[in-house]
């Protein structure tokens, strides 16, 4: 990248070299981590703009610093665009991350010790949905729901039983490793019956929701949180959507509650990404993500891998690698050695520890951003199968050649030199 050579290399060759190496990794490896994606040049440019210099504590029109007239425009653009994208009454675009967004909702609506119902991390939930090592699990009394052992899908009758038994102040839906559609309408019915607030963390599926490929939680949830990267293909950051009646409480929870100054350069990048997501081609992109995931999942199943829940409805799949005599940790390492990046992942009712696991998580947003199609997915599945079925140098060489050919055929940022 020219900016590395021109601006960073003369000033800091060590950082420049690390960035250059990461660029090479992204270009010449196949990125299958479900939570990662490749942003547009426009998003990158906005994030690297002069807005990084501006402090802007507060909200548009109500800042604690002068000179905010132009960053106010940017933040208002981001808020209005994302409200239009999801049909929301209120949006806060200041959270630095999805974790910050979730924490802000808890901070706004709960008191320490309040009971919350959230999805078990080992069944596909998220760290911030009550894990005992996270602030959510330390400060609040989380009760976990999971998936049925036979179907590996959420059993809404069990969720209802738990909700009526524990009467939580808040029910949290959403996941980091759940390959099926979530019925937000049903969960809102359960929340109403139990007298609970309802929050949806749609971080992984926000792009699919924006494109109309997954039920939109906004009409059903009191609060919707998300990251702005992943399927939404924006910068790394967070977002909260809510009904107008909760707007003041949410805004106060973010600032001055848990954050100081917003990252205005990131908010600018969010605004650009939301603008991109409002275009018709974004819908087609999301359709390709889902189609690619379906074909990749089916092809891996044909090659003898067990796919958790039998398939996928969204952008990701969980692959049980025990049929290859491997752990998730081993599979992650073997695939990385041939240029395929995945992450080890616990599968429901996993007998292995979270640091070892029996599965890997695979997602298609990043490869779809490179332009890869269903034929490419079949080639990726073949490369994965060869690498994991033939864990020797001969198998690795075959898989590496397949990866190199795909990366050459579908270049990343081809004009960014």
UniProtKB/Swiss-Prot annotation:
Domain of life where this protein originates: Bacteria
Catalytic activity annotation: (6R)-5,10-methylene-5,6,7,8-tetrahydrofolate + glycine + H2O = (6S)-5,6,7,8-tetrahydrofolate + L-serine
Enzyme Commission number, as recorded: 2.1.2.1
Annotated residues for binding of (6S)-5,6,7,8-tetrahydrofolate: 121, 125-127, 245
The keyword NAD is annotated on this UniProt entry: no
GO cellular component, one term: cytosol
Modified residues (N6-(pyridoxal phosphate)lysine): 230
Keyword Transferase in annotation: yes
Record SUPFAM superfamilies: PLP-dependent transferases
Keywords: Amino-acid biosynthesis, Cytoplasm, One-carbon metabolism, Pyridoxal phosphate, Transferase
Example GO molecular function: glycine hydroxymethyltransferase activity
Biological or metabolic pathway of the protein: One-carbon metabolism; tetrahydrofolate interconversion; Amino-acid biosynthesis; glycine biosynthesis; glycine from L-serine: step 1/1
Site feature: Plays an important role in substrate specificity: 229
Intracellular or extracellular location(s): Cytoplasm
Alphabetical GO biological process terms: glycine biosynthetic process from serine; tetrahydrofolate interconversion
Cofactor: pyridoxal 5'-phosphate
InterPro entries, alphabetized: PyrdxlP-dep_Trfase, PyrdxlP-dep_Trfase_major, PyrdxlP-dep_Trfase_small, Ser_HO-MeTrfase, Ser_HO-MeTrfase-like, Ser_HO-MeTrfase_PLP_BS, SHMT-like_dom
HAMAP family, A to Z: SHMT
Family, similarity comment: Belongs to the SHMT family.
Function summary: Catalyzes the reversible interconversion of serine and glycine with tetrahydrofolate (THF) serving as the one-carbon carrier. This reaction serves as the major source of one-carbon groups required for the biosynthesis of purines, thymidylate, methionine, and other important biomolecules. Also exhibits THF-independent aldolase activity toward beta-hydroxyamino acids, producing glycine and aldehydes, via a retro-aldol mechanism.
Record text on subunit structure and interactions: Homodimer.
Protein name per UniProt: Serine hydroxymethyltransferase
Species, as recorded: Desulfitobacterium hafniense (strain Y51)
């Amino acid at each position: 990248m020219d900016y590395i050579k021109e601006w960073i290399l003369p000033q800091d060759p060590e950082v420049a070299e690390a960035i250059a190496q990461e660029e090479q990794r992204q270009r010449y490896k196949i990125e299958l981590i479900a939570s990662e994606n490749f942003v547009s040049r426009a998003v990158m440019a906005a994030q690297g703009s002069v807005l990084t210099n501006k402090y802007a504590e507060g909200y548009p029109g109500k800042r604690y610093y002068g000179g905010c007239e132009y960053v106010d425009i940017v933040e208002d653009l981001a808020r209005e665009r994302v409200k239009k994208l999801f049909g929301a009454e209120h949006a806060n675009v200041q959270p630095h991350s999805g974790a910050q967004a979730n924490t802000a909702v808890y901070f706004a609506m709960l008191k320490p010790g309040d009971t919350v119902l959230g999805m078990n991390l080992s069944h596909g939930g998220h760290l911030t949905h009550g894990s005992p090592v996270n602030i959510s699990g330390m400060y609040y009394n989380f009760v976990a729901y999971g998936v049925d052992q036979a179907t590996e899908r959420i059993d809404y009758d069990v969720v209802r039983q738990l909700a009526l038994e524990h009467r939580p102040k808040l029910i949290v839906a959403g996941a980091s490793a759940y390959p099926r559609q979530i019925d937000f309408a049903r969960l809102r019915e359960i929340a109403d019956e139990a007298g609970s607030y309802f929050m949806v963390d749609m971080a992984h599926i926000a792009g699919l929701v924006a494109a109309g490929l997954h039920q939109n939680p906004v009409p059903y949830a009191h609060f919707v949180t998300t990251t702005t990267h992943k399927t939404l293909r924006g910068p790394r950051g967070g977002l909260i959507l809510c009904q107008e009646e909760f707007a003041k409480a949410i805004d106060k929870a973010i600032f001055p509650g848990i954050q100081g100054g917003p990252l205005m350069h990131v908010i600018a990048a969010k605004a650009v990404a939301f603008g991109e997501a409002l275009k018709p081609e974004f819908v087609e992109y999301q359709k390709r993500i889902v189609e690619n995931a379906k074909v990749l999942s089916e092809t891996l199943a044909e090659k003898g891998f067990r796919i958790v829940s039998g398939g996928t409805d969204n952008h990701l799949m969980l692959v049980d690698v025990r049929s290859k005599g491997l752990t998730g940790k081993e599979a992650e390492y073997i695939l990385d050695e041939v240029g395929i990046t995945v992450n080890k992942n616990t599968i429901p009712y996993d007998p292995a520890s979270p640091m070892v696991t029996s599965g890997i998580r695979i997602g298609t947003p990043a490869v779809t951003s490179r332009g890869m199609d269903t034929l490419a997915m079949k080639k990726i599945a073949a490369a994965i199968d060869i690498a994991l079925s033939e864990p020797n140098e001969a198998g690795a060489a075959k898989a590496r050649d397949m990866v190199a050919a795909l990366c050459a055929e579908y270049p990343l940022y081809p004009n960014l030199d």
